[in-house]
Design a protein with these regions (language model features):
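Compact, glycine-rich, soluble single-domain proteins
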Residues: 5-86
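Intrinsically disordered, compositionally biased charged tails
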Residues: 1-3
């Protein structure tokens, strides 16, 4: 499976940076699943779940405080007040 570079940052610093298979967060219009090769876009993220699938198939589940996500051709940047992973 192709991967995409995911960077999650808050005002306090970097929360996560690395290659992932995918990311699921909740946007203003519903859940967003971002995979490698996704069409570029920018949208707000509302508080709720944050699910990251790592290249080894493991999953990081967390809760996000919301923020802004930018999906580019090569990477995904998520700016948030915070994410708490289980």
């Amino acid at each position: 499976m192709k991967t995409v570079l995911l960077n999650i940052s808050s005002p306090d610093g970097k929360i996560f940076s690395g290659e992932v298979n995918g990311l699921v967060v909740r946007g203003v219009a519903g859940d967003l699943a971002v995979l490698a090769g996704h069409v570029p876009f920018i949208t707000n993220v509302v508080p709720g779940k944050c699910i990251i699938e790592l290249p080894d198939g493991s999953v990081k589940n967390g809760t996000t405080e919301g923020g802004l996500i930018t999906v580019g051709k090569e990477d995904v940047t998520y700016l948030t007040a915070g994410v708490t992973f289980e």
